[in-house]
Amino acid sequence: MVPLMELDELCLLDMLVYLEGFMAFVSIVGLRSVGSPYGRYSPQWPGIRVPARPAWFIQELPSMAWPLYEYIRPAAARLGNLPNRVLLAMFLIHYVQRTLVFPVLIRGGKPTLLVTFVLAFLFCTFNGYVQSRYLSQFAVYAEDWVTHPCFLTGFALWLVGMVINIHSDHILRNLRKPGETGYKIPRGGLFEYVSAANYFGELVEWCGFALASWSLQGVVFALFTLSTLLTRAKQHHQWYHEKFEDYPKSRKILIPFVL
């Protein structure tokens, strides 16, 4: 028999998933009209701004801390099962890279508006809790789920997406030589096909995670990722075309050959 407290938390997780889906819809509608206020698109409003490196570290930290907490917590009921451990590890690995590695590699990132930083921190806290608690406490998989075609395909997409994301970030960081300023057209890798190759990689990564986890939690997270990254990708695409007369006309916005 499932304890009452676990039933209450499962109901809470269900409500939070639907809330995240609603947030994805609001994000698509809202950001379409105002754009994504970060980086070079950050409005010149007065107020507090957070330096790029600490902003990235702090805002991503909750999504690394939640799965780590679940791994060391003896009462994590489902982490005795291999599929749950692997899926939670997939989530954790991404956020270890985003929390501990990515901020260190940033070169001259623009300060982040406090409100943007706070919203990102709250989302990572919220989503980190939803994904970590579901996988560690409630998700039920057969032991051989890790050999199922859905899991294997999803895991492959997750891995390929992460490689694309990290490689594309590397290209962006190295556009300027030491001492150079200004902007350049990204070239190489998936940037030959889309304006936002790093975002495409992250989208593929979370779509793979959703397929591998075969869960509403994973699907909604992938949809939320699409809702935010598509807006940013459109901004990049438009900005590149306005900034550079020789910007390749054949490049798509986010998805090669499609969008």
From Swiss-Prot:
PANTHER family membership: 3-OXO-5-ALPHA-STEROID 4-DEHYDROGENASE, 3-OXO-5-ALPHA-STEROID 4-DEHYDROGENASE 1
Induction data: Its expression is regulated by androgens such as testosterone.
GO molecular function: 3-oxo-5-alpha-steroid 4-dehydrogenase (NADP+) activity; 3-oxo-5-alpha-steroid 4-dehydrogenase activity; amide binding; NADPH binding
Family: Belongs to the steroid 5-alpha reductase family.
Name the UniProt record assigns to this protein: 3-oxo-5-alpha-steroid 4-dehydrogenase 1
Membrane topology: Multi-pass membrane protein
GO cellular component: cell body fiber; endoplasmic reticulum membrane; neuronal cell body; perinuclear region of cytoplasm
Alphabetized Pfam families for the sequence: Steroid_dh (PF02544)
Organism lineage: Eukaryota, Metazoa, Chordata, Craniata, Vertebrata
Coiled coil segments of this chain: none
A Gene Ontology BP annotation from the UniProt entry: androgen metabolic process
Role, per record: Converts testosterone into 5-alpha-dihydrotestosterone and progesterone or corticosterone into their corresponding 5-alpha-3-oxosteroids. It plays a central role in sexual differentiation and androgen physiology.
Gene that encodes the chain: Srd5a1
Expressed in which tissues: Liver and prostate (at a low level).
Top enzyme class: oxidoreductase
Cellular compartment(s): Microsome membrane; Endoplasmic reticulum membrane
Reactions catalysed: a 3-oxo-5alpha-steroid + NADP(+) = a 3-oxo-Delta(4)-steroid + NADPH + H(+); 5alpha-pregnane-3,20-dione + NADP(+) = progesterone + NADPH + H(+); 17beta-hydroxy-5alpha-androstan-3-one + NADP(+) = testosterone + NADPH + H(+); androst-4-ene-3,17-dione + NADPH + H(+) = 5alpha-androstan-3,17-dione + NADP(+)
Listed transmembrane segments: 10-30, 86-106, 111-131, 146-166, 206-226
EC identifiers of the protein: 1.3.1.22
Keyword Magnesium: no
